[in-house]
Amino acid sequence: MVLCMSKSGGSLTGRADTVLVILLAALIFGGALMFSSAAVGLLARGSTHISGVVFNHFALGVGLGLVFLVIGFSIDYRKWRIVAPYLFGFALIATLMVFIPGIGMEHGGGKRWIDLGFVTVQPSELLKIAAVIVSAAYFAALRAEASTWKGLAAFGGIALGPALILAMQPDFGTLGIIVISIFAVAVAAGVRLRDIGIMGLAAVGVLLLLTLTPKYHYVFERIDTFINPAAQSAQGQGYQIRQSLIAIGSGGMFGRGLGQGIQKFTYLPEPMGDSIFAVVSEELGFLGGGICIGLFLLLGLKGYGIAARSPDLFGGLLAVGISTYLVGEAFVNIAAMLGMAPLTGVPLTFISQGGSAMLVSLASAGILLNISRKFPKR
């Protein structure tokens, strides 16, 4: 489906879309409440770093992220088209730096972080938005030629760099979000689904071959856990999913109450990270979990609406990519916690622990807000 833009010129209204502001505020404020509740679980686990964890999340993640949101909102989104290739190149180089001894950090079998001394950063988070921006810029330049072989080449070429680097880390969760986001931009630009499907099947074939090697066998284990969770051992690959489902189910319709969850204290792995949606559902119930899902769904619909009303093709494609990235990441996380998809390790947007993810997500939201200011005069 090709994205159709308004032909009239854009004008800076000075005001962001009100509904978008409300949705973002609800997710950010609600996410802060749920993170605070989930962080209490560290006390029962004997952690002495709860103050540092909370400070890093709110000061470096939310606080600095809101500053970047304001910056993203203040910069004319069309300027990102000029710097797109340089930003993408910088993000690729930064993501490669995780392999430099003494700088790169390894955790849980993956090399995904850079140690700056006073803070650690995950450069692949920057790669998400950089890939979206460069995709929007390139496909906007192609215009009608997006439906030709040039469009397919652009899709494959932009995805190839992140694919090679993230496969070495390995981090297929982040790679999946990048590919989904680029895919959305490509489809909106007019690239044929059949062509992308053929390329996608080839990529899946390569991934299946990789799972036969020891380094990537964990991918096969996660898929096997998703297909047959009952066959896993009590503390095996299916443990996190089972504990997540227990937490979600025990919340009932209205939940145990904010801060009253039990699973976060000892049983639920990563209650502030991947599993925070389970904490939301246990404490706020089916109603609270449903509201969380509904907010993300509305955010996606609003983002695509902004894309359709954008005065130029680049703005429309950029809005599609950002909306897909922010909402797609959330739905992938939630689906895994509900046992509807394999575990990927991607965070719940605006809610999970992770300063780099929070900062980039908020900056991306700022860019989307700026696009919403550019509606043509009626």
Predicted features along the sequence, with ranges:
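TM-adjacent membrane-interface loops and short helices in multi-pass inner/ER membrane proteins
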Residues: 226-273, 286-288
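Short linear Ser/Thr-Pro motifs
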Residues: 36-40, 261, 352
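Glycine/serine-rich anion-binding loops at beta->alpha junctions
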Residues: 117-127, 168-170, 252-257, 345-360
